[in-house]
Amino acid sequence: MSSLLGIGGGGNVGVAGGGDFYSYSIDQSLRLDGSTAYLSKSDFAASTDTTKRTFSTWVKRGNPEGVGAYNHIIGAGSSAIDGFGFANGTAKLQWLQGGVVTKDGVRDLRDTSAWYHIFTTWNATDNEVYIYVNGELDYSSTNSIDALSKLGNTGHTTYIGKRSNSGVYIHGYLAETVFLDGTIGDVNDFGELVNGIWVPKNISAASLTYGTNGFYLDYADSSDLGKDVSGQGNHFTSNNLAAHDGVPDSPANNWCTLNFNDSRTSLGWQEGGLRWFSASYSYKAFSTMVIPEISDSDTYYAEYHMAADGYSGGIAPLSNSGSNSNTDLTGFLAYAYNGNFYNNLTATASGYDPVVGDIISIKAGNGQIEFFLNGTSVGTPYTGLTGSYKFGAWALGATGNGMYWNFGQDSTFAGSKTGSS
């Protein structure tokens, strides 16, 4: 079966042109659910130099809007905190030092189909701060700054994926997370432009100086997602994470998810855009990636675990999106919790009624759509289809635990079920 192509800018799928495009491939990432999951380390030794810090990570956002104040990727301190992440109520990057909003980036990072490379340096010796996004300078300053005395230093817990003094969590994915203690790094050691696209480089080949408290988290060991592979032994503790939170979604292998920017606001948006539960009838959410032409011989596959009644899944034309996604059902083809097939609001009985806990699979291509219930076909209700489509979730009135989706990256459905594929 075929990979989905990116709808919006920033996604690498369908753009790169095969494995030769990347001189170095990242094969996995850490999924953060946006509600309880994070990494922490409370036993750092004395820092090499708190005036010089370098931080680099790749991030794919799950929910760029529904976050609390100061949504930090990394931070430390219970008060007067040091932290770096997303600013209060925006999708811009921001540094806090000693609890004070210090430096703000310019670019809004809202594309949930995209992997972004974020690189920043803090040099209180020379009063220099730099923030880069995908190799491009996003912010620079030469104004006077103080040391980051809490981040990666003894006496303070450093967090990844959580604001250090509040229950505000990152929702999305992190890959290749690196911290240099006492060293100002070079963004070109972490990525490079290939055909105009910023792609990852092999960090191990860069001869980085990590310092006493530096670390490199590659998230490759699903049994120990906080393992430091820098050689410094600065391992992090996993909190509310499991083996299934190590996923193959990565900057070099970008997977489809549901798209926060192409949905009606819901009660919940978790598990890296793979869990959705709605607040009301007619709410919908669509995939980040598109079936380019459904009449082609390629086939495209997705599945979801029905964790509550009241939900359906299927495909919809690209026109069924954006601001009208909560009202317009034109062309939406679905198999629902009540056993009906739907074309818009026109229902046809399938003869197979799913129940909570079942897995519904969707196979689209060759001009048709076929549905499966726990691996058994329940019919091919719609044929002769043409044009571009995307996968979609549709709530028919219920809330509850919603639905967990799998586009091939997690057959456990975030640990809620064993997949049928």
Feature-to-residue mapping (PLM):
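Extracellular glycan-interaction patches encoded by glycine-rich segments
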Residues: 101, 151-174, 396-398
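Glycine-aromatic-enriched beta-strand/loop faces of beta-sandwich-type recognition domains
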Residues: 312-359
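Short surface loop/edge beta-strand patches of beta-sandwich-type extracellular domains
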Residues: 33-53, 102-110, 163-166, 200-208, ...
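Extracellular glycan-interaction surfaces
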Residues: 7-34, 56-65, 80-150, 342, ...
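Short hydrophobic/aromatic patches on beta-strands that form ligand-binding or substrate-lining surfaces
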Residues: 55-63, 118-120, 160, 174-179, ...
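Low-complexity, glycine/proline/serine-rich flexible segments
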Residues: 2-51, 90-94, 99-100, 154-160, ...
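Extended recognition patches within non-cytosolic domains
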Residues: 2-28, 35, 136, 142, ...
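Extracellular glycan-recognition modules
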Residues: 35-94, 127-128, 183-188, 294-296, ...
